Amino acid sequence: WEIPTYIHCPPVMKDAQNKLSKRNGDASYQDLVTKGYLSDAVMNYICLLGWSPKGEYAEQEIFSLDELVKIWSPDGISKSPAIFDPLKLRAINAEYIRRLSPEEFQKKAEPWIDSAVHTPIDKKLLCANLQPRCEVLGEIPEQLDFFDAMPEYDVSMYANKKQKTTPETAKEALEALL
C-alpha cells in the first residue's frame, strides 16, 4: 500500500492581505459569466492562478480545455498565494472573443445587442465591427446606447478648427449618419 500524496493549491487573494471571498461581495464564476465573460476564458484564467505551465508552454497564456487537461501537472503549482487580477481576466476574455468565428461571436453577442438596440439593424455588420473592440460581452449595451437615442454631449467637443467643423455641422453629419 502506497501512502497518498496530497497537494494543496494556493489561496486566491483579492490583494496582498485579503482572500477572495463571496462573503465580501467578490465575484463567483457564475457572476463573471452573467457579466458577459466567456466560460472558457474564466476557466483558462482560474487555471493560471497559482499554477504555471512548464516546457514549451511556459510562455503561453491562452489554452483550450483539451490543452489544459493534457499539460496540467502538479509540478507547476506555486507555493505563494495568487492575486486575482480583473484586468488580466479582461485581457484573456478579450483574446477569447477575438478568436471566436464571426458566427460564434454573433450568437453570443445577440442577447446583449437585443437588450440595447430596438431598431432594425444588420447584426452581422454590427458584430463585425464590435468583435475586435469587445472585451466583455456585458459591455455591449453601453457601446450601442446611441442607436435608439442620441445621447447628450457637450457641444464644444464637436468643434474642430483643423477640419472646420462647428457644433451645428457636426450635428447635421451625425444625424445623417444615424
What are these regions (language model features)?
Residues 102-178:
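Small-residue-rich helix-loop
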